[in-house]
Amino acid sequence: VSGQGEFHLRTLKWRIGNNEKLMVEFQEPRIPYRETITKAARADYRHKKQSGGAGQFGEVHLIIEPYYEGMPAPESYKFGNQEFKMNVRDTQTIDLDWGGKLVFVNCIVGGAIDARFLPAILKGLMDRMEQGPLTGSYARDVRVCVYDGKMHPVDSNEISFRLAGRNAFSEAFKNAGPKILEPVYDVEVLVPSDK
């Protein structure tokens, strides 16, 4: 069903309801916003939960920045008077279903976090990319460098690192100059020619 405005749509709703005896519902259209960031930011998050037996523990330190195609590998970041040198171990580029990319860079040195927990951290990041920290819209074009963290020999598990990664990402995203991207559509207008 289409119309030239709200009046036309209400008239159609009335006609369908009265003539065809069908119930028609109107819903507000959901605008497909996207979220992204404009500058680099750093965050760390410790997920710690203790309840009787084995608890949960995972700590993630990360830096996020805007991503663009052809961007060089990160070497160092400076925040205030602190400089962070990056030793890139591995890079994963993920093409997002909703457009854009997430680049996940492993810069962990010295076994601060076992490699077996990196997929869990990535899942936590994807949780937040699918439901952005600002409006709940999809986030896009972000590079995340995980450079440090802590684990516990007994209490660390995948869920702990998934939650730590997700919450560290949210915190960093909010400090990275977040912005909302509005959709742009191609529109073709056809009009009859006057002869």
Which residues make up each language-model segment?
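Accessory interaction regions appended to the cores of large information-processing enzymes
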Residues: V1-K195
